[in-house]
């Protein structure tokens, strides 16, 4: 058994020699003999045959070597196939991860850029809206002051009309008293007050009346009284009409201001709400940009890690493939050597005498 193992080890070492199919048995043995292990195995084989050892035992050993090499190759093929499947799965996952990070980077870059553009537009618009609010408030203040001035003017003029109408009514009463026969001396005090009030107004409308009343103070006659009463009635009617016109103007201006102020207030509300919306949007835009920049940095790092992992896996796979191919090639060469030795033993060295003859021819 020990002898068989020794021969097996020597033959296995010899099997690593690389030969070509066109070589003759002499050439094969010559190449084997150049190696120390080859020389030893040839010596053992020669001794084996010289002492009558069976050639079949050597054939069995060579068959065992070939079987071992084929078995090792099958195991290597199986491991290689399993590693290839696992590698392809890892590569597919990494490529998918890389594609995901690349997509995220593009999306985040677009988000950052579009949000930055939107931020710039919002900042410009908020300045415009702020200016519009200031203009709106100024317009409201100016128009409100104008309206207040209009109202104050109406109040003043309406009060003047009331005073004037009261003076006309008082003058009518005095004239009617004179017409009824009351002495002027009894009405003088009232007459002078009315006359003074009418003169204070400095209204052209009252000038004929003032002149008529002045004449009446010096001479009272029925004809003059009738003319004065008619004049008083006309003046009062004009005052009533003028007062009504002023009131109509006041009401129209008040209604217009109510509409205008409502529009200004609505515009102010809209502008304030728009400004608040824009300011809130600006805050959100800045947050979004910051988050996008941070996420972009993270995704870039993740992409670099995934690409590094892919490169490492590809290098590992290339090394494994190279090692597998080298080992496969080595086994194929070893099997070829074993097959050549088997061919020599089977076809050329079937008898001990023939082997010894070839041995002597070679060496």
From Swiss-Prot:
The keyword Calcium does not apply. Its main location: other. Two components are produced by post-translational processing from the precursor peptide. It is found in: Trichocyst. Residues 85-119, 244-352 form a coiled coil. Residues 18-52, 190-221 form a propeptide. Keywords: Coiled coil, Signal. Residues 1-17 form the signal peptide. GO terms for cellular component: trichocyst. Structural protein that crystallize inside the trichocyst matrix. Belongs to the TMP family. This is Trichocyst matrix protein T4-A.
